[in-house]
Amino acid sequence: MKMTKLATLFLTATLSLASGAALAADSGAQTNNGQANAAADAGQVAPDARENVAPNNVDNNGVNTGSGGTMLHSDGSSMNNDGMTKDEEHKNTMCKDGRCPDINKKVQTGDGINNDVDTKTDGTTQ
């Protein structure tokens, strides 16, 4: 099948326009709320922004109630590093990151009564 340059140009233009129209139809131009979400992110009132809609069946009176902040221990006290040396603080931070310098000093594998604190996590002592 032999095509002339004009026919090739016409076919290419038709396919380009058709694919562009298909992409525009899929984008959902009528329901696009990107500008509303951007306005809501900037602090403006945007009632049509989906980000401002509360989840279904949520009672806002029960959110963040009680005394104190949300980062408290179960006994209501906050965590501090009072009484820790700089070395202890460093080891504690390293272990929180998963890079404990001496895992046997931080991990208790038994009940702590039978002097099994210095055993490895698999129960061995080597």
Curated annotation (Swiss-Prot):
Basic and acidic residues: compositionally biased ranges: 84-105, 117-126
Biased composition regions of type Polar residues, renumbered to the chain: 54-64
Signal peptide: 1-24
Record field: transmembrane: none
Residue spans of biased composition, Low complexity class: 27-47
Keywords: Signal
Region entry Disordered, spans: 27-126
Protein name, per record: Uncharacterized protein YbgS
Originating organism: Escherichia coli (strain K12)
